[in-house]
């Protein structure tokens, strides 16, 4: 197990023998259910605001299939939703997760719009954590029960959670591949090369 410091807290990662990795994420929760926003030319959109390591607005997508062929239209729709959510009282939300039915054996499929109009090719670890928080709050997923989240490409994460007070601690498991190697240089004269203590 490896402890990784992130800007929102410590997460732990476990490498499994089959090459998959499990990440126990930061405490996650749903902040608001059924948040309505008005979108020009579209009308009312209803979704949940949740924290899973990033702030998400999660909304069911009923008009478009969540597949790669629709990525430009999905990006534009999610961007408009984000602008409406930000303008109507939720400036902290910087990710939009459109979700629908699973198409490849999963419980659900998602399209996640990230800051800068980028989209996540994976099912999104923080987005899956936010989704688990909503499912837990609605009592639609029991503690320890598995949830299979598909990405727009059909790749999958398996998520589950345990309760910790008013929060859940989500664990997300998926495939991992080595894509690079880095070297850290620790200078003798750098007083902070080993970090800082508090």
Locations of regions flagged by a protein language model:
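Active-site proximal loop and beta-alpha junction motif in alpha/beta enzyme cores
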Residues: 1-198
């Amino acid at each position: 197990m490896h402890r990784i410091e992130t800007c929102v807290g410590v997460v732990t990662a476990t490498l499994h023998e089959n090459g998959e990795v499990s990440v126990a994420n930061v405490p996650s929760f749903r902040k608001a259910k059924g948040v309505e926003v008005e979108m020009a030319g579209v009308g009312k959109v209803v979704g949940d605001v949740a924290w899973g390591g990033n702030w998400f607005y999660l909304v069911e997508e009923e008009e478009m299939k969540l597949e790669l062929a629709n990525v430009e239209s999905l990006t534009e729709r999610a961007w408009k939703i984000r602008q409406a959510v930000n303008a109507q009282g939720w400036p902290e939300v910087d990710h939009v997760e459109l979700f629908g039915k699973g198409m490849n054996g999963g419980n659900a499929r998602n399209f996640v719009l990230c800051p800068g109009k980028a989209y996540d090719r994976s099912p999104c670890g923080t987005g899956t954590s936010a989704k688990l928080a909503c499912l837990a709050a609605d009592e639609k997923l029991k503690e320890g029960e598995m949830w299979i989240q598909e990405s727009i490409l059909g790749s999958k994460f398996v998520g589950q959670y345990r309760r910790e007070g008013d929060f859940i601690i989500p664990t997300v498991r998926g495939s991992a591949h080595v894509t690079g190697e880095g070297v850290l240089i620790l200078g003798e004269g750098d007083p902070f090369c080993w970090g800082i203590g508090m």
